């Protein structure tokens, strides 16, 4: 899909970046959920969905603990899956905790203990109607190194859920699933997952697909060669019936891949962002065809950044600084949606003081206001 623009924003952004840092002039930062002593995190793992001005986001709610490294969550205390919903385009939010979405009992999710009361894992028969606009799925993992993984599904915009359903390993040493999928048709879905490498460690991106409404899920392809380090946490956009662009988290940068045969094979386009401290991307397509990527910036000054591509991911702008007031590197995992009015809602976990709780925040902003 090609779009002719009279004055490409990308060119303007590059020229502007030579003179000053890029920021949206109208960005509004909001607290979505914050509670003293708690760790709220990782929207990128759980997913975001929208229906007009109705937006639904998932996240993990555990307990804060000031660890020596990594995430500041107490791995010895149970965590739970939580949703937050906005009916006004991200201005206000309410917390939801459907019973069917809770993690399986007495195990781990993303290495964090689960409680005793969640529904047990089971094999699910499939038969899902992907053409239902209210149908959504979320994918979760036990260990970030080697899985295993499961999924939940909802047919009513996340008000009620069924699961957890065993996902399988697709012949891989392990599957560490987060939520990234594309609906291709009423019974056809492509899912982008992280698999363990041959040494049993994270990870590399694989593509799986169902053509029979989830009754069977089949391995389709690897996205790139097995890395020496890791290549994980994809975020995908369909450009056409055959073309898909996917952004992938690397150790300290973001890779962008493209497939022109609907996911059968992939080519590396570029590194969209470098030296960011390690954080997953969230990529969406604007109404005019531009690609917009957001991610957490885990170096000083800590914050949330964005970049834009005018040419389907071939090149990217300089960083757009959504905020720079982070208290430490334990932040990010963004997910972004485009509202009907064209404004963007970027949701992420955040901190303004590294020694205090992690909270869920949102930035509402307009790409057209970037200067």
Description of each model-found segment:
Residues 20-371:
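Asp-box/BNR beta-propeller blade signature and adjacent active/binding-site loops
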Residues 1-4:
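Positively charged n-region of N-terminal signal peptides that target proteins for export
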Residues 6-15:
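Bacterial N-terminal signal peptides
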């Amino acid at each position: 899909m090609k779009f002719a623009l009279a004055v490409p924003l990308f060119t303007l952004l590059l020229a502007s970046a030579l003179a000053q840092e890029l920021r949206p002039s109208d960005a509004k930062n909001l607290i979505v959920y914050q509670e003293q002593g708690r760790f709220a995190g990782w929207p990128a793992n759980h997913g975001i969905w929208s229906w007009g001005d109705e937006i639904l986001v998932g996240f993990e709610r555990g307990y804060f603990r000031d660890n020596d490294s990594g995430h500041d969550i107490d791995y010895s205390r149970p965590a739970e899956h939580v949703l937050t919903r906005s009916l006004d385009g991200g201005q206000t939010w309410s917390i939801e905790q459907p019973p069917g979405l809770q993690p399986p009992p007495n195990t781990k999710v993303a290495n964090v203990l689960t409680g005793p009361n969640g529904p047990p894992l089971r094999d699910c028969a499939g038969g899902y109607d992907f053409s239902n606009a209210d149908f959504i799925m979320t994918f979760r993992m036990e260990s970030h190194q080697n899985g295993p993984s499961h999924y939940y599904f909802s047919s009513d915009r996340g008000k009620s859920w069924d699961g957890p359903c065993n996902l399988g390993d697709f012949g891989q040493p392990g599957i560490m699933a987060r939520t990234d999928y594309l609906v291709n048709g009423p019974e056809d879905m492509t899912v982008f997952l992280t698999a363990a490498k041959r040494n049993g460690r994270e990870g590399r991106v694989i593509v799986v697909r169902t053509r029979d409404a989830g009754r069977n899920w089949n391995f389709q392809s690897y996205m790139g060669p097995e890395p020496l380090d890791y290549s994980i946490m994809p975020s995908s956009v369909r450009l056409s019936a055959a073309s898909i662009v996917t952004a992938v988290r690397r150790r300290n940068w973001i890779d962008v891949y493209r497939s022109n045969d609907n996911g059968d094979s992939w080519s590396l386009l570029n590194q969209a962002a470098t030296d960011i401290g390690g954080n997953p991307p969230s990529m969406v397509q604007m109404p005019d065809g531009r690609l917009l990527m957001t991610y957490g910036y885990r170096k000083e000054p800590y914050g949330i950044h964005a970049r834009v591509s005018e040419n389907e991911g071939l090149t990217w702008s300089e960083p757009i600084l959504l905020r720079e007031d982070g208290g430490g590197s334990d932040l990010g995992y963004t997910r972004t949606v485009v509202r009907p009015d064209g404004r963007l809602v970027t949701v992420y976990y955040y901190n303004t003081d590294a020694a205090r709780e992690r909270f869920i925040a949102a930035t509402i902003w307009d790409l057209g206001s970037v200067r």
